[in-house]
Amino acid sequence: MSGWIIKARRTPGVRAVDQGGPVLIARETVFDRDEMFALYDSVDWDGYTSDVDRMMRGLANSHLVITARDESGELLGMARTISDDAAVCYVQDVLVHPRHHRRGVGRALVEHLKERYAHCRFFLLSTDHESTEEGRRNHAFYRSLGFLSYEEKEMSAFGLPRVR
């Protein structure tokens, strides 16, 4: 991995190639508040950016956080999970900065998680409803990675009303 300076907070992972050059997917355990805020803000996830302390607690308490960075160390995207690492893995967040959409970054992040949690009975995530523009894009993306809706798996999912 020439050209990379891996700091102690990062565990080197798999490499992917985005159209702009090599991308490193790595586990991170220490998070720069401003950098994480900028990434969540770039995709307009106000539910996170409206309470940055809570966002940082969520990152710290995740089972796994992986990032995608370019050769200069710029954060391109990240994904995080909540898991018992035995039966269930829930993909909590997958974000890619809009400047890097449609370059394979999100795919590399999710493929890394699929491999990491292949032993789990359930590998789940939630996304926007397909009646929304973002939902249509997300559904197509996750389907291209082999995901099925709960209904297609003859399952149901339930949730309480959103707390704002």
Please report, for each region that a protein language model flagged, where it lies by residue:
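Conserved acetyl-CoA-binding loop-helix of GNAT-fold acetyltransferases
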Residues: 96, 102-115
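Conserved active-site alpha-helix within GNAT-family acetyltransferase domains
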Residues: 107, 119-124, 129-163
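Short amphipathic alpha-helix that is part of the acyltransferase structural core
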Residues: 3-49, 153
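A conserved beta-strand-loop-helix scaffold within acyl/acetyltransferase catalytic domains
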Residues: 55-95
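Structural motif corresponding to alpha-helix initiation and N-cap regions
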Residues: 33, 49-53, 107, 136
